């Protein structure tokens, strides 16, 4: 039996950061980092309505296959992602797909034909999730969500790999480690991720997987290499439809 966090509300009784209430949020949620990306993803929903926009969290709710589906931006990094997750779970959400962008890491990921990655697990190279549970606990995706993403990808014939993401706290620690006094440690660890077949580097998935596991929710992630593309958004929406249909069975 999973335990929810205590609700913290604003003066309207809404969740403190996302400024939403239970009736605003669907069971199924798409999670981009960027608030502007929510507008693009919301166009894939039927009857999408803007519910709230507070700080980095912009939230739309509409339907897919007749079920209520929400799009909510997490902002950049694990702290704001964990906050969004907790508050969406307070509102009754239990199924999450991150729709993000990422960088390439291991040699295999540098195959230019690959559009992106369906994430199966995340390296907890960040500071948020140790506030939840010791580092030995794995950050893994829900197998039903991975399978729904894999089915969507197979049906469309798009070229996505499956693999592990590194969730880090410093974008410039990845892109310019030599400018950091801590460069030795950054290089050593990056080499370890390259040698251990890490397929993607990004900043939110570890928090998504850890908070979801601990709170008893299901989560997965699909990420585009470089900038966001239509295929990644399409597959995330298709996977939500697969889960909706399978949940009815
Ligand atoms: O495209 P999003 O979802 O923001 O994800 C990636 O892009 C940002 C860095 O540019 C980080 O948030 C990283 O995880
Ligand atoms: O290289 C990249 C691209 C997106 N997001 C990251 O964190 N790194």
List the model feature ranges, each with a label.
Residues 1-148:
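Metabolite-binding pocket within alpha/beta catalytic cores that recognizes anionic/polar moieties
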Residues 48-53, 156-164, 222, 243-249:
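Flexible, glycine/charged-enriched surface loops at secondary-structure junctions
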Residues 90, 182, 214, 222, ...:
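Expand to "…catalyze enediolate/carbanion chemistry for C-C bond making/breaking, isomerization
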Residues 99, 215-227:
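Glycine-rich phosphate/pyrophosphate-binding loops
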Residues 136-195:
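Active-site rim beta-loop-alpha module in soluble metabolic enzymes
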Residues 139-140, 154, 207, 247-249:
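A generic structural signal for tightly packed, nonpolar segments enriched in small/aliphatic residues
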Residues 187-220:
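A C-terminal functional module that forms or caps the active site or interfaces directly
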Residues 227-249:
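His/Asp/Glu-rich mid-to-C-terminal helical/loop segments that flank catalytic regions of hydrolases
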